[in-house]
Amino acid sequence: MAQDLTESLNERQNILNNRYALQQAEQHLELGGVYYNGDMVFTKQQVIALYDISERTIERYLLSHDEELKSNGYQILRGVKLKKFKGLASGTDIHDGTKTTVLGIFTFRAVLNMGMLLTESEPAKLLRSRVLDIVLDVMAERSGGHTKFINQRDENYLLAAFQEDNYRQLFTDALDDYVEGNKWKYGNFTNLIYKSIFQENAAEYRRILKLAAKDKIRETMYSEVLTLISSFESGIAYEFEVASNNKGAKLTQTEAKALIQKFEQHPLYKPFIIEARTKMASRDLCFRDALHEKLEAYIKAVPEADFERFLGEKSKSLEEQLSDPETLEVFKRLKDR
């Protein structure tokens, strides 16, 4: 979260999509509001008072960030909905009068959204600081105190890692059998695959995630990235075998590299490469505060489903997953195939 929230839509949405952070923020900030349709909501006048801004200021932001604010809970009430709201708000100080025919209301999420946009409000600046602290606390608590291996909390991680290990062996065997060269070829060709998928070699990836020398980089990769690496390793191993058999001899490293470059360009892999780059770049910036500069163009806001995947009730540490009898039974069946 290095960027100013007022300047980055993705940074704002990464907070607003994190329901665990929103729950804690709503509890700690105690902003009040009126209970309506399952949410605490606030009128425009209440938001004006909260952030100590003018009506002209809030109208300017409602106009310039209309789509964003509406997607996060801002709505305009008319007719029956407005009548119902006025009935619920009766006796509260909503400051909008009984003759109002349209009324803009903000959910708590939309109130935070407005606070992340306002540059001329000191209360909004203070709120942003408090919210960022809450987000960091929630992230640490729900990820077990660190995010280096947050990828492993995904219930799909173990299976992806298990399969990737098998395909890795297939790939190294193909390098042995069908490609000339010394022991350095394993690292060199692995880096070619990494660069094909996420435009970084192993050393660059390790530096960006600030991994220790003992850390294995594939243990920090998301399941979708591991699965794509598996596809590349399996497919390239096959291409090496076919090309070597057709040649009647081992491939030179130049020939093998050309095959990888051709493999990378196949239209079949384009959507999967884009997905892997987007998820790696977006998740690492959000969860690990790690920026993949070569993938910056792929960064998007992390969707709500990803917060459930890595921080939700179903997410578990690797140790917890490995102690689950059902998980162990699945891996026993896979191993026995």
Spans of features found by a protein language model:
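N-terminal, Lys/Arg-enriched amphipathic/low-complexity engagement segments
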Residues: 1-30
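Short Lys/Arg-enriched helix C-cap and helix-to-coil transition segments
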Residues: 69-89
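Positively charged, phosphate-engaging catalytic surfaces used for nucleic-acid and nucleotide handling
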Residues: 1-9, 117-337
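DNA major-groove recognition helix of helix-turn-helix
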Residues: 62
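The alpha-helix within a helix-turn-helix
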Residues: 48
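A short, Lys/Arg-enriched interface patch at domain edges and termini
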Residues: 88-130
